[in-house]
Curated annotation (Swiss-Prot):
Cofactor(s) recorded in Swiss-Prot or TrEMBL: Mn(2+)
Keyword flag Hydrolase: yes
GO biological process, one term: adenine catabolic process
Name of the featured protein: Adenine deaminase
Keyword terms of this UniProt record: Hydrolase, Manganese
Keyword Manganese: yes
SUPFAM superfamilies: Composite domain of metallo-dependent hydrolases (SSF51338), Metallo-dependent hydrolases (SSF51556)
Source organism per UniProt: Clostridium perfringens (strain ATCC 13124 / DSM 756 / JCM 1290 / NCIMB 6125 / NCTC 8237 / Type A)
Amino acid sequence: MQVELIIKNLNVYNSYFKKFIKGDILINKGKFLHIGKGYEDRLWSENVIDGEGKYIIPGLIDIHMHIESSMTIPREFSKAAIKHGVTTVVADPHEIANVFGIRGIEEFIKFKGNLDIFYGIPSSVPSTSSSLETTGEKITHNEVKRLLEYDNIICLGEVMNFKDLIEDDDSNINKIINISKEKNIPLEGHCPKIQGVDLSLYIYRGVNGDHTQQSVGSLQEKIQNGMFIEMQHKSMTLENIKFLIENNLYEHFALVTDDVMADKLVKGHLDEILKEAVKLGMSIENAIYASTYTPARRMNLLDRGTIAPGKLADFILLDSIEDFNIYEVYKNGEMVFNRDKGLKEEFFEDKSKLDYRFYNSIELNNITKESLEVKVPNKYKNKVNCRTMKVLKNTTFTEEGEVTLNVYNNILQWEKSSCALIAVFERYGKNNNISFGLVEGEIIKEGAIATTWAHDHHNLMVMGRNISDMTIAANEVINSRGGYVVSKNNEVIAKLELPIGGIISDEPIEIIGEKLGEVRSAMRDLGYNHMNEIMSFSTLSLPVSPALKITDKGLIDVKKGSIVSLFK
């Protein structure tokens, strides 16, 4: 029997024994046909390659990520990710859903990349409720029914609305979960700092996966209660990895990326998380297992994730396993990336364009300096105690603080304080909301930052040390149809345009990455000190991430799930 491809003399990763075994691989019709030896008198090919002792592993599978986090479209994401050995992803498009609703999800699904992109249904759009944040659209149980008909929808995306989930049987999120259960798909969670009975109630509803930041304690409690853990970068600590190794928990977690910024994507993706696990003490064999086999099983992708007869021939050839140096990447038995030759461009032939309406979504006039004046109620005379959001250096969580500020003519005098002012402007043309907050910590010491890439509602958010720079930065974002802008001394010093929904661009990923790198550098130059400046700032607006956040409706006490006043 003739087969399409034979690669000889390889060290083949075997998922079942978690070790490398010397042998050959035979591929036919995009799938592995035979692994090993003893085939010569029965199977042959006109296309035989000498593997020269290279290491072959399954293509990497990332089961929790957001393409919009890379600020790009599926085609450009595919081209970038496949260079890093990623051949399958499960994307939760809840960012585009918050802006455009089901129309955005369906457009994203049609707007193909050429690695396998499966999707989770955004379950929490908005992330909380319309009483706490304004979004462009909503996803209800009716839209979920429609989306479940798509073949490449394979799970329910992260369930963030914890309060409604456990307190209201008739809530939209419980209706969504009940519909999803009928399809027997995985239900993905988002449950940071939820524990005890609250965690049990959360799991009882059927949500049994979590990707949020973990500690040893949360890992133990969640896994022993049946949760599958998705380990992203901020959970990759020495203590966490040691706990997983010592307790032999390899069947209960996978490595994922969640959010990879464009400037980071050009350098690495899931391969970087894998290498980080190895640096922290995990064997390369087990790190590969957690990046291929367990994620495939979690998402019922039983046709991939291992090198075995009948499985998809998605694989990576490595020069060595010590440095995880990728030589080639194959998709469905076809070489799509070579380290020396680059991408096989014809593999990425999709040239479709988004509808023009996706490029004009900012319904907001230019703001004025007067609109940034914080008016104080008459009952406060010369001074007022204010809540603050304290930015923490190594997490996207905040702490609530307090500061006493002067009041003059009912206007808050904040510019000479230790705090920056933050404001959120509703951008969908629905209610013209404006809210204010105060931010402290190792943030900018001068200038301003503005963005519509503000999780998850993606309204216009601006933070600064003076009203003039805040106005300039915010208006530059509006005039760019969305984006990220940094200003200083009344000038724009860095800018990334994101005209699609105010959150993504269709420029090549290298250009997006370069511009985002300039924004990141400018934020650092202004004094922002954080492990990920972009995510730190952009999640100040995320009302499901502890402890005090801001939306267009006001300051949100995340634990209570309620609006609290800036003034105490």
